[in-house]
Amino acid sequence: MPQVEHQNSTVLTDDELRTLDAHWRAANYLAAGQIYLLANALLTEPLSPAHIKPRLLGHWGTSPGLNLVHTHLNRVIKARDLDALCVWGPGHGGPAVLANSWLEGSYSETYPDISRDAAGMGKLFRQFSFPGGVPSHVAPETPGSIHEGGELGYSLAHAYGAAFDNPDLLVACVIGDGEAETGPLAASWHSNKFLDPVHDGAVLPILHLNGYKIANPTVLSRIPEPELDELLRGYGHEPLHVTGDDPHQVHRALAEAFDRALDRVALMQRTAREEGATERIRWPMIVLRTPKGWTGPAEVDGRPVEGTWRAHQVPLPEVRENPEHLRQLEGWLRSYRPEELFDADGRPTADVLACVPHGARRLGATPHANGGLLLRPLPIPPLDRFAVAVDKPGATLHEPTRVLGDLLEQVMKDTSARRDFRLVGPDETASNRLDAVFDASGKAWQAQTLPVDEHLDRHGRVMEILSEHTCQGWLEGYLLTGRHGLFSCYEAFVHIVDSMVNQHIKWLKTSRELAWRAPIASLNYLLTSHVWRQDHNGFSHQDPGFVDHVLNKSPEAVRVYLPPDANTLLSVADHVLRSRDYVNVVVAGKQPCFDWLSMEQARAHCARGAGIWEWAGTQNDGEPDVVLACAGDVPTQEVLAASALLRRHLPALAVRVVNVVDMTRLLPREAHPHGMSDFEYDGLFTTDKPVIFAYHGYPWLIHRLAYSRTGHGNLHVRGYKEMGTTTTPFDMVVRNDLDRYRLVMDVVDRVPGLGVRAAAVRQTMADARTRHHAWIREHGTDLPEVANWTWEA
């Protein structure tokens, strides 16, 4: 590995030191002003209670450190003409990032009513954490942000996601020492083993040790520096330390650290790109240790504040009520000497702006933080090239995800030059039958390789790490900066990112309301190895509840699809990969599955989202006696098997079969953009006939989606009810009363008049279930009549 030493130590001139400090002081002033001031933004008169916000909200403690980093990033971006993005892990330091955006002018360009003058400063202060204003965190409303930082742990994964396939981009990532204690952040350190120095950009982690969380010390700030260095070097970084509480000394040391780090990054990238990458790089990082709440009140009411946990939020909490707090606040604000930082009209002075880059080089104006501006349509080949031939329903079987894998392989090939599509997953690409993609791209890997390894590739675009958090963080960062991707995961274990998807949906919902944010590619989940075919791994691997979780979220941003076969999966995949600003959840099987629909039929059915399969039922021109509804591949097979049994045993019964692909179709139109009108729903499911619904997941979800429908009282749902174990595939459905025999029994029980007339049929079905129990316990396999079942029209 090439070595680099910074031969000439960075020596800031007096002018550079003065202007850097002026910028930092201005940002600190603006950050504090946002927390406290309702009026008198430039302190042109003595501060009075009337100038103070009635409710003080915000986080001061991290803001001076974020302002310091932003100031020094400005310096190196301008000096080196860098294309840069910053991920602010301590997103509760929103006042700092807003202050810097206003200083550089990107805020006023985004929000012209918040001008870069005294009037605009007053509005900037008033709107912060104020009704009708802006949130306290680095939310989507903040120019330059791709990471809100409200829920901690995801900053570093987002930063790496942004850097992948962005070879000219520097992504700085500020990691708070509180966030550094989270599990997702701990796993994210390993992302450097996946960063390709040839095709990817660089990530510069900046670990900010200000010593405290809300009310406790932080772990990494209280271990000896040699131990911390060992930890960070073990993660694969070369730490550069900056420690101090004297502003001028810290400015000089931080400028030196940035230059050393970026010199090393430039050398590493240049060597890899000119000579080829042959071994893993030890990337630099900065460890910045400064006081929490630096430059704020040293003491309040006789208790230390600066450099303690008491500086975390609002260090002076009673400014309106307490004259001493008001006096301290005015002294604090005037300590920044705002008259030197802003002219009489409130505009930043030349010294303040001396370090600020221009145009799109400004952190608040980078198009990488508004990725939709950079997004190109994904080249998706014609589906007919990959469709399975279906001459008649149920005559052939295919593994749906394997068929999808062929499509994804072609997408990988078609994006090989432009490199804007990635497949991520926690070590499950091959298990989920998507391994055809390895013919187009290997698995990204920069660590040691052995002869036994397969498909590892320093330049690969398939990303596998056994951390669902890191997978999701990578993909979110990749999407937010204008690219495309797919997250493949075992259905049960996607719950690990429940909270992460909450945050992404919130981001999408807010972004949709901002005209200046361009739509980004959707976050697409492929959930497979699902509940009904985890018979071999058992109860721990059986949980279909992610769909329930997602459908609780903002309806304008979430979609859920359960394609029943290979061709419908292709159609759904084509749709979600083209979509924008959604979280799409696709649940599909990887085991051999009957092919029900031709490609043409699949397109039409998926476009409807729900529809009648006339060939599967026995209803003629009249009304049905019963509706058999299904959603999901295994429930669809069981419904069709039940329909066949009814045709044989009760041929006079008029059975309608309805298949649902788009779960949100069940919602009322006023509750979801895809929802059906009552007229449509009643036409499909009737208002007065029994509906036996076989559903892939927890049955209560169907009741919740359809509770307001006219015929809800006639709706009877079968699904997974936590009756799981290691057993045979068919026993899984029997244990949960989703099997064909139970569905026929439900029909007999619920169609008026059948209870007596069809008692013998019901008994036959019950006997079949009894026979099943005895058979599997003796033979360990399903009944031949089940294992060898085929659809016969």
UniProtKB/Swiss-Prot annotation:
<dbReference type="Pfam" id="PF09364">
    <property type="entry name" value="XFP_N"/>
</dbReference>
<dbReference type="GO" id="GO:0005975">
    <property type="term" value="P:carbohydrate metabolic process"/>
</dbReference>
<dbReference type="Pfam" id="PF03894">
    <property type="entry name" value="XFP"/>
</dbReference>
<dbReference type="InterPro" id="IPR019790">
    <property type="entry name" value="Xul5P/Fru6P_PKetolase_CS"/>
</dbReference>
<dbReference type="Pfam" id="PF09363">
    <property type="entry name" value="XFP_C"/>
</dbReference>
<dbReference type="InterPro" id="IPR005593">
    <property type="entry name" value="Xul5P/Fru6P_PKetolase"/>
</dbReference>
<dbReference type="InterPro" id="IPR018969">
    <property type="entry name" value="Xul5P/Fru6P_PKetolase_C"/>
</dbReference>
<dbReference type="InterPro" id="IPR018970">
    <property type="entry name" value="Xul5P/Fru6P_PKetolase_N"/>
</dbReference>
<keyword id="KW-0786">Thiamine pyrophosphate</keyword>
<keyword id="KW-0456">Lyase</keyword>
<comment type="similarity">
    <text>Belongs to the XFP family.</text>
</comment>
<protein>
    <recommendedName>
        <fullName>Probable phosphoketolase</fullName>
        <ecNumber>4.1.2.-</ecNumber>
    </recommendedName>
</protein>
<dbReference type="InterPro" id="IPR029061">
    <property type="entry name" value="THDP-binding"/>
</dbReference>
<dbReference type="InterPro" id="IPR009014">
    <property type="entry name" value="Transketo_C/PFOR_II"/>
</dbReference>
<dbReference type="GO" id="GO:0016832">
    <property type="term" value="F:aldehyde-lyase activity"/>
</dbReference>
<dbReference type="InterPro" id="IPR023962">
    <property type="entry name" value="Phosphoketolase"/>
</dbReference>
<dbReference type="InterPro" id="IPR019789">
    <property type="entry name" value="Xul5P/Fru6P_PKetolase_ThDP_BS"/>
</dbReference>
<dbReference type="GO" id="GO:0000287">
    <property type="term" value="F:magnesium ion binding"/>
</dbReference>
